[in-house]
C-alpha cells in the first residue's frame, strides 16, 4: 500500500475516553523496546512519525494513526518495563484491556516478539489473551537483521514453541533496517480490509 497520508488522530492516556472509530483498526502490542515504533514507521513509510526511543517504556499512551483516511494503526504501550511503577503498570493494563475488549473495529492484534530471544512470560500472557478473546494471532518477529540468515528458521521455531503456537499461526519476520517482511505484513493487513488494496507497496 502506498501510504500518502498519515495523521496522529487520537492519543489516549489512562483517563482518556477511547475513540469510536468507524474504520478498521490494527493494533500493535509487544514488550518495551521490541521495535514497535520502528515497525509502524516502516509500514507507514515514515522515518520518525511514530516516536522511537532507546529508553524502554517511552510509549505511555494508546496512539491512533489514521492512514489514507481508510484504516488505523493503534500503537499500544509496551509492557514488561521494570522501572515503571506497579500502579502505573496496572493502569496501563486496564487501559489496554479496555481498548482491546471494547473496540468494534479491531481486526488484528499484531504481537511483536524479538526474534533473538525466547518469548517472555509477558509475551506468553499476551498471546494467550489474544487467543482467548477470539482474535487470530499474528506474530511479527522483529529485529531480523540482528541474526544470521542461516539462523532464521531456528529462531522462528523457538518463537513458535515458546508461545505454544500452532503450525497455522502466522509468524512474519521483519527488519526495521532493510524493511524485509514489510510486504508480507501489508498483505496480511489487506486481507482484513473491505476492499483489498493492490497498489504497489
Swiss-Prot record:
The gene is engB. It comes from Lachnoclostridium phytofermentans (strain ATCC 700394 / DSM 18823 / ISDg). This is Probable GTP-binding protein EngB. Residues 22-195 form the EngB-type G domain. One of its GO terms (molecular function) is metal ion binding. Necessary for normal cell division and for the maintenance of normal septation. GTP binds at residues 30-37, 57-61, 75-78, 142-145, 174-176. Keywords: Cell cycle, Cell division, GTP-binding, Magnesium, Metal-binding, Nucleotide-binding, Septation. Mg(2+) binds at residues 37, 59.
Amino acid at each position: 500500500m502506498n501510504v500518502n497520508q498519515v495523521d496522529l488522530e487520537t492519543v489516549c492516556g489512562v483517563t482518556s475516553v477511547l475513540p469510536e472509530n468507524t474504520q478498521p483498526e490494527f493494533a500493535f502490542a509487544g514488550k518495551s523496546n521490541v521495535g514497535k515504533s520502528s515497525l509502524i514507521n516502516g509500514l507507514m513509510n515514515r522515518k520518525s512519525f511514530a516516536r522511537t526511543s532507546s529508553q524502554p517504556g517511552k510509549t505511555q499512551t494508546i496512539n491512533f494513526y489514521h492512514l489514507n483516511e481508510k484504516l488505523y494503526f493503534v500503537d499500544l504501550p509496551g509492557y514488561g518495563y521494570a522501572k515503571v511503577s506497579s500502579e502505573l503498570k496496572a493502569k496501563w493494563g486496564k487501559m489496554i484491556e479496555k481498548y482491546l475488549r471494547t473496540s468494534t473495529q479491531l481486526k488484528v492484534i499484531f504481537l511483536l516478539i524479538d526474534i533473538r530471544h525466547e518469548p517472555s512470560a509477558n509475551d506468553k500472557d499476551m498471546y494467550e489473551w489474544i487467543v482467548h478473546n477470539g482474535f487470530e494471532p499474528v506474530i511479527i518477529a522483529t529485529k531480523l537483521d540482528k541474526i544470521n540468515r542461516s539462523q532464521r528458521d531456528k529462531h522462528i521455531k523457538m518463537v513458535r514453541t515458546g508461545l505454544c503456537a500452532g503450525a497455522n499461526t502466522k509468524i512474519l519476520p521483519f527488519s526495521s533496517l532493510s524493511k524485509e517482511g514489510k510486504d508480507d505484513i501489508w498483505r496480511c493487513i489487506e486481507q482484513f480490509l473491505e476492499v483489498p488494496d493492490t497498489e504497489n507497496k
